[in-house]
Curated annotation (Swiss-Prot):
It comes from the Bacteria. It comes from Clostridium botulinum (strain Loch Maree / Type A3). Belongs to the DnaA family. This is Chromosomal replication initiator protein DnaA. Its main location: cytoplasm. Plays an essential role in the initiation and regulation of chromosomal replication. ATP-DnaA binds to the origin of replication (oriC) to initiate formation of the DNA replication initiation complex once per cell cycle. Binds the DnaA box (a 9 base pair repeat at the origin) and separates the double-stranded (ds)DNA. Forms a right-handed helical filament on oriC DNA; dsDNA binds to the exterior of the filament while single-stranded (ss)DNA is stabiized in the filament's interior. Residues 73-106 are annotated as: Domain II. Residues 324-445 are annotated as: Domain IV, binds dsDNA. NCBIfam families: DnaA (TIGR00362), PRK14086.1 (NF010686). The lineage of its organism: Bacteria, Bacillati, Bacillota, Clostridia, Eubacteriales.
Amino acid sequence: MSTHLTETWEKAINIIKGELTEVSFNTWIKSINPISLENNSLKLAVPNDFTKGILESRYKDLIVNALKLLTSKKYNIDFIVTTEEKIEKNHNNEKSNIVVNDEMSTMLNPKYTFDSFVIGNSNRFAHAASLAVAESPAKAYNPLFIYGGVGLGKTHLMHAIGHYILHNNPKSQVVYVSSEKFTNELINSIKDDKNVEFRNKYRNIDILLVDDIQFIAGKERTQEEFFHTFNALYEANKQIIISSDRPPKEIPTLEDRLRSRFEWGLIADIQAPDFETRMAILKKKADVEKLNIPNEVMVYIATKIKSNIRELEGALIRIVAFSSLTNKEISVDLASEALKDIISSKQTRQVTIDIIQEVVANYYNLKIEDLKSARRTRNIAFPRQIAMYLSRKLTDMSLPKIGEEFGGRDHTTVIHAYEKISNNLKKDESLQNAINDLNKRINQK
């Protein structure tokens, strides 16, 4: 970067500063860095896509006018997200933790690395297992099956594994694919008579990462093809990593031969983050995105948003945008105003196992203690199974946690209860009515 460009930019932002509130300037303009100036085209580095969008829609003309005032020239402004810039510079031998080896490997998100993953009690085991697999592919745990709710970090860990392996061995053939994309490619290969090419793509590789495997349930041809792909890779001592929103035993209409193979290696779950982890996630996000957020505001967000990381980070960005658009300082009051729709919606649908146990016990004229007891008489065992079924359906609690809430029962007992009620619902109209009634009562709590 030339000294002239640096000096010109510093003068320009001084002009811009006089046109904006301190909040808007610090949030959107301060983080910009000039990259290059060629043929009246100015490239400016920005920290993220969100900032880029705001700058292009609200502040681009302001920047153009400030530069025109200084130089009497009208520049074309091109905002470049810094992460993309780093990837580009990798080809110029700059130090980078991400190695791109071919077209398939570019499916990996450069932001999803082990360094950017925030570790907490809710994901420590899954993180450790993922790192072990990344360090010793096909030697530690094969397959590695990661499951958990939406937005908890499963995809992040899968991409991190891919990046780590490629960093240590750039020649590794790493393929990341969603089960939906796998299915669509299979359909196209059948339609275009390219079965051989399809099989070569997925069987002649070193690492296969398949996201959201639950979506192949009920797709017989996809399951057949994936079964043979799995076998080919496993027998060739290649690493397989799979993610799902539920454990293998709970994926409906999944062939038993696939279910058993998914259970050959290690199964690791990710739970919703606790308060300390939520705070760490927010602080890391603010640091990475160069956002100036008061600590008390992050405490407020972490207290109100508990379900998943995606919503947590989304709340942070929403507050920053709200602050800029209203020209108000970021505070707890502003955060409350910005998130009022999200928080009220969350609060109205928050269901706990305690609520479920209370409603089910009342419905069947039992005590909550009966549902937690060791008694197995039908008048208690059946309502207990219904309560376990509803706990699995309506909460984000893990199977072991649900079992613990019902008198310290094993997670396999919860699975049995869930499967039994699910199967009976298909043919028992009175049970369907009971479940519908219970759902209404739970939602009214």
